[in-house]
Regions:
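Short, acidic/polar
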Residues: 15-30, 115-128, 173-182, 263-272
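Aromatic-rich peripheral "rim/lid" segments of glycoside hydrolase catalytic domains that contact
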Residues: 16-17, 247, 263-268, 272, ...
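Glycoside hydrolase catalytic-domain groove-lining segments
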Residues: 62-63, 68, 76, 83, ...
Length: 330
C-alpha cells in the first residue's frame, strides 16, 4: 500500500497551522509512521444554492498557514496531497450543492456561475500545490449534487492540469464510485470509504473483515474497468459504541465510548486492503490541529482522533510493516 496517510487540519481557523499547538499536533501525527499527509481545509459559499465561493480574511486558513504545514511535512520526507474543500455557511452538506439545469432561455446560468467560481478557487490552490511540490492534488470532496455535470468537471480537470503537473483525484462518497462518469480523466479513483461494516455495536474484527471483503471485491471490479487505482481519500470512525455501523457519524455525542470497536474497524480494513496491488492507499480521517497529550485525556474523547487510543497502535503496526516492505524491495 503506497499511501499510508492521514488527513490533517480540517476546519482549522486562520493561524492554526502556524501555532505551537498546531505544530505539536502535526509532529505527533508524523510520529505514527505516515508517509503521506492530506492537508484539508475549507472555504465557504453562503448557502448551498450560492454561486460564489468567498475567502474570509478573518477566519479562513491563509497561504502562510498552508506553506507552514507543507514545509513541516517535507522536512520529515512526508508527501503531501493538497485538498481544498468547499463548505456551506448555512450548515448544509456540500453534497446538496445543486442548481436547475437551465432557465427559460435554455441557459445553464447558475451552473456556469458556480463552476466559474469553483474553478478559480481550485486554480489558486493548484498553483500552490505546484509551487510547493505537493505530490497530489484533490479537486473536490463529496459534491454529489454536482457530479452529474460531466462536461463542467472535465473542463475543471483540464484547467487544473494546465497549472498542476502531478497526479490529481476527486473524492466521491462511498457507494457512488461507479456513478462518477469522468473518473477516467483522473489519476486515482478517490472515495470517502465510510462503509458500514457492522449492524450494531460490539461487532468483532472478523465480522468486519467479512464485510470489507465484499466491498473490496466490488471496488476491484471498478479499478480494473477504469484501469485506475482506488484511493480512500477519507475513512475512519469514532471511538464510540456502534461506530462501525455508521462510520461517518460525528453527531451522536451521547454514545458510549468504545476504543475496541474503533480499533477493529481500522484493523479489519487494513487487513483486507493492505496487500492489494490495485489499491493505492488510505488517508484516515482525521487528525485535529489541536490534540490532547495523554491517555487519560484520550479517555474523554469519543471523536475520530486515534491519538493515545488502541487504533493508534493498529496504525503504527501496519504503517511500520509498509515501511519495512518498501525498504526490503529497494
Amino acid at each position: 500500500m503506497e499511501v499510508r496517510g492521514f488527513t490533517y487540519g480540517y476546519m482549522a481557523k486562520r493561524g492554526a497551522y502556524q501555532s505551537e499547538a498546531g505544530k505539536k499536533s502535526q509532529e505527533a501525527m508524523f510520529d505514527i509512521g505516515i508517509n503521506w499527509m492530506c492537508l484539508a481545509f475549507p472555504l465557504y459559499q453562503d448557502t448551498y444554492q450560492s454561486t460564489k465561493i468567498r475567502f474570509d480574511y478573518r477566519y479562513d486558513i491563509t497561504e502562510k498557514d498552508i506553506l507552514t504545514a507543507i514545509k513541516r511535512a517535507k522536512d520529515r520526507n512526508i508527501k503531501v496531497c493538497l485538498k481544498p474543500m468547499v463548505n456551506c455557511k448555512d450548515h448544509i452538506w456540500r453534497a446538496y450543492i445543486d442548481f436547475p439545469e437551465e432557465d427559460f432561455l435554455g441557459e445553464d446560468t447558475y451552473w456556469k456561475q458556480w463552476f466559474e467560481s469553483y474553478t478559480a478557487f481550485l486554480l489558486h490552490y493548484a498553483e500552490i500545490a505546484q509551487d510547493t511540490g505537493c505530490e497530489m492534488f484533490c479537486i473536490g470532496c463529496e459534491m454529489l449534487g454536482t457530479e452529474r455535470k460531466e462536461e463542467y468537471w472535465r473542463e475543471v480537470i483540464k484547467r487544473v492540469r494546465e497549472v498542476y503537473k502531478g497526479p490529481i483525484t476527486y473524492n466521491t462518497n462511498h457507494g457512488k464510485e461507479d456513478k462518477v462518469t469522468w473518473f477516467d480523466a483522473l489519476d486515482y479513483i478517490g472515495t470517502s470509504a465510510y462503509y458500514p461494516v457492522a449492524r450494531a455495536g460490539g461487532a468483532t474484527k472478523d465480522s468486519m473483515v467479512k464485510e470489507w471483503i465484499k466491498i473490496r471485491d466490488d471496488l476491484k471490479v471498478l479499478s480494473e474497468k477504469l484501469n485506475k487505482k482506488i484511493l480512500f481519500m477519507e475513512i475512519g470512525c469514532r471511538s464510540a459504541k456502534g461506530c462501525a455501523s455508521m462510520p461517518w457519524d460525528f453527531m451522536h455525542k451521547e454514545l458510549e465510548r468504545e476504543e475496541e470497536e474503533q480499533a477493529a474497524f481500522y484493523e479489519s480494513c487494513l487487513e483486507v486492503f493492505f496487500e492489494e496491488p490495485w489499491f493505492q492507499g488510505i488517508f484516515w480521517w482525521d487528525w485535529s490541529t489541536v490534540i490532547y497529550d495523554t491517555e487519560e485525556e484520550a479517555k474523554n474523547d469519543v471523536g475520530f482522533n486515534i491519538h493515545r487510543k488502541k487504533a493508534e497502535t493498529v496504525i503504527k503496526k501496519w504503517y511500520q510493516k509498509g515501511k519495512e516492505s518498501e525498504e526490503t524491495n529497494r
